[in-house]
């Protein structure tokens, strides 16, 4: 095995990156580290698209890390992700394996691939008051003016956007010291799915997850005492399904709004990954529609080329 420290599999939602990563991990006899900002929560399964059955290949369970590690309602952040990633990474490396990082949360991916440690950012009440009356569109415009690392792909609520700006303001005014974080030599593989196929898969998967009980999952979380605002904070499925569950939306409004939001989210993910390329990352793109064996051979060939 060449001197790569990590293989990263990234792609938009519904691109098939998880089955690909699991099949690759089975082939290389290794383990997966998730890079998904919502799959870290226990009990939030259908709404985050965990699809844990994808980690079973030919009857063999592929070990995965950083899924189901926090309770719903908790505000897990990128600083904790870096810490937990390193723990998982070192655990896998100690077994003599090449870890596979897989996910679609741009901030989490880039925070470990870029190789510098982020530091916790305190709340700025004065800034929060100043931004409180602004719309999500206005806040997104402010956020896009910053050049540093914040993941606008996951900013789909006012609360998240304000927190994102708070982080950017803090970094803009705080000298960035050299921070200890391993410089990982990573082979980055992007799963490129045709736009129309992606849209079709998103809609089909949304209908399937609703049939499987996604509304009931949200109602259960609410019944367990998770506050509606906390679920709405997680965005996408949890935002729309919570608004439906508490009577603020009809079923049709929920479905149409959520379907549109997921399509927009996937588009923003691709914009983020293209931005990574502009920021100096080399992403080797593989066609999502290729047979699994061909995709795995593509990665193995890239490993040999190193």
From Swiss-Prot:
Signal peptide: none annotated. Keywords: ATP-binding, Magnesium, Nucleotide-binding, Transferase, tRNA processing. GO terms for molecular function: ATP binding; tRNA dimethylallyltransferase activity. The record marks 105 as: Interaction with substrate tRNA. Its cofactor is Mg(2+). It comes from the Bacteria. ATP binds at residues 11-18. Residues 36-39 are annotated as: Interaction with substrate tRNA. GO terms for biological process: tRNA modification. The keyword Transferase applies. The keyword Methyltransferase does not apply. It catalyses: adenosine(37) in tRNA + dimethylallyl diphosphate = N(6)-dimethylallyladenosine(37) in tRNA + diphosphate. Its EC number is 2.5.1.75. Substrate binds at residues 13-18. Belongs to the IPP transferase family. PANTHER family: TRNA DIMETHYLALLYLTRANSFERASE. HAMAP family: IPP_trans (MF_00185). Monomer. Catalyzes the transfer of a dimethylallyl group onto the adenine at position 37 in tRNAs that read codons beginning with uridine, leading to the formation of N6-(dimethylallyl)adenosine (i(6)A). This is tRNA dimethylallyltransferase 2. It comes from Bacteroides fragilis (strain ATCC 25285 / DSM 2151 / CCUG 4856 / JCM 11019 / LMG 10263 / NCTC 9343 / Onslow / VPI 2553 / EN-2).
């Amino acid at each position: 095995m060449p001197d790569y420290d990590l293989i990263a599999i990234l792609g938009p939602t519904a691109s098939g990156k998880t089955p690909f990563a699991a099949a690759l991990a089975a082939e290389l006899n290794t383990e997966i580290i998730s890079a998904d900002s919502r799959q870290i929560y226990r009990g939030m399964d259908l709404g985050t698209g965990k699809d844990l059955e994808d980690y079973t290949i030919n009857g063999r369970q592929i070990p995965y890390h950083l899924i189901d590690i926090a309770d719903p309602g908790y505000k897990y952040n990128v600083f904790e992700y870096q810490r937990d990633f390193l723990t998982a990474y070192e655990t896998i490396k100690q077994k003599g394996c090449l870890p596979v990082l897989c996910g679609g949360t741009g901030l989490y991916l880039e925070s470990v691939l870029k190789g510098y440690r982020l530091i916790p950012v305190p709340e700025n009440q004065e800034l929060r008051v100043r931004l409180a009356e602004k719309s999500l569109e206005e806040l997104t415009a402010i956020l896009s003016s910053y050049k540093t690392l914040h993941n606008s792909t996951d900013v789909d609520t006012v609360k998240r956007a304000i927190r994102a700006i708070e982080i950017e303001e803090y970094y803009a005014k705080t000298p960035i010291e050299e921070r200890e974080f391993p410089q990982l030599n990573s082979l980055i593989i992007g799963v490129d799915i045709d736009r129309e196929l992606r849209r079709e898969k998103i809609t089909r998967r949304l209908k399937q997850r609703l049939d499987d009980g996604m509304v009931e999952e949200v109602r259960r979380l609410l019944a367990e005492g998770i506050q509606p605002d906390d679920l709405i904070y997680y965005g996408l499925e949890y935002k729309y399904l919570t608004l439906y569950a508490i009577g603020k939306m009809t079923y049709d409004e929920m479905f149409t709004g959520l379907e549109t939001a997921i399509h927009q989210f996937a588009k923003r993910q691709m914009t983020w990954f293209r931005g990574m390329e502009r920021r100096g990352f080399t992403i080797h793109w593989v066609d999502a529609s290729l047979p699994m064996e061909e995709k795995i051979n593509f990665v193995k060939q890239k490993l040999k080329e190193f």
